[in-house]
């Protein structure tokens, strides 16, 4: 029997971009933070759980990175899809007001109990159902504050239900955020063109010399 194929969800892309944003901003991460899952609720079929301890002591910074990552990942989605996600998560993706405080952040801030060691008693994964002979890797990110974990849980519940074709995954991980990558491609293309022109020139010279030597 063949091993099941792992499929990506929009939430997987979100986690990858979130980790990337943490590295871009050189944010100090504490990987020794604690996490405890007392109960897992929801539908969980052919899904595998992975916990990532990436704790940030700054609550406001955690929220800002979460919102930026959400906007990065959803930038290629249609207007309708953005509106659906905004409603499900509780964050208006289309709102660019720097003073805007999303509803989900207010709710999480008012209900969360902040401690030095994050203790998640109940984890609600919503619906995590992979198609038959497929698998989904569900990554739980412990961001270091109870409030940010609450927001992350809402994002996970919404995005984990949206499958992504692996062939199109780079449409979501926008390459324009990697100028060095684009610059490298341009340099390689220039070198390639110069190389082709040089080969043609050498062939032309050899043929010209040949006509004088052998005719």
From Swiss-Prot:
Disulfide bonds join 33-55, 47-128, 108-150. InterPro entries: Virion_mem_poxvirus_L1. Disulfid bonds are oxidized in the cytoplasm by OPG088 protein. Unglycosylated because produced in viral factories instead of the classic ER -Golgi route. It is a single-pass membrane protein. It is found in: Virion membrane. Keywords: Disulfide bond, Late protein, Membrane, Transmembrane, Transmembrane helix, Viral envelope protein, Virion. The chain crosses the membrane at residues 179-199. GO terms for cellular component: membrane; viral envelope; virion membrane. The keyword Transit peptide does not apply. Signal peptide: none annotated. Component of the entry fusion complex (EFC) composed of OPG053, OPG076, OPG086, OPG094, OPG095, OPG099, OPG107, OPG143, OPG104, OPG147 and OPG155. Except for OPG095 and OPG052, each of the EFC proteins is required for assembly or stability of the complex. Component of the entry fusion complex (EFC), which consists of 11 proteins. During cell infection, this complex mediates entry of the virion core into the host cytoplasm by a two-step mechanism consisting of lipid mixing of the viral and cellular membranes and subsequent pore formation. Belongs to the orthopoxvirus OPG053 family. This is EFC-associated protein OPG053.
């Amino acid at each position: 029997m063949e091993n099941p194929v792992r499929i990506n969800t929009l939430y997987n892309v979100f986690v990858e971009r979130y980790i990337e944003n943490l590295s871009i901003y050189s944010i100090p991460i504490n990987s020794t933070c604690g996490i405890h899952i007392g109960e897992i609720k929801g539908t969980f079929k052919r899904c595998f759980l992975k916990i990532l301890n990436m704790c940030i002591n700054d609550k406001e910074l955690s929220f800002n990175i979460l919102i930026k990552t959400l906007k990065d990942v959803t930038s290629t989605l249609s207007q309708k899809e953005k509106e659906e996600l905004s409603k499900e998560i509780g964050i208006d993706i289309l709102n660019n007001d720097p003073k805007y405080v999303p509803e989900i952040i207010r709710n999480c801030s008012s209900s969360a109990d902040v401690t030095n060691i994050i203790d998640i008693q109940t984890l609600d994964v919503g619906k995590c159902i992979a198609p038959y002979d497929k698998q989904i890797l569900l990554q739980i990110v412990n961001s270091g504050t109870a409030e940010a974990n609450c927001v992350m849980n809402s994002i996970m519940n919404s995005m984990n239900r949206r499958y992504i074709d692996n062939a199109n995954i780079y449409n979501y991980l926008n390459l324009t955020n990697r100028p060095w990558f684009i610059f490298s491609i341009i340099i390689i293309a220039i070198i390639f063109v110069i190389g082709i022109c040089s080969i043609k020139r050498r062939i032309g010279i050899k043929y010209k010399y040949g006509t004088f030597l052998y005719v």
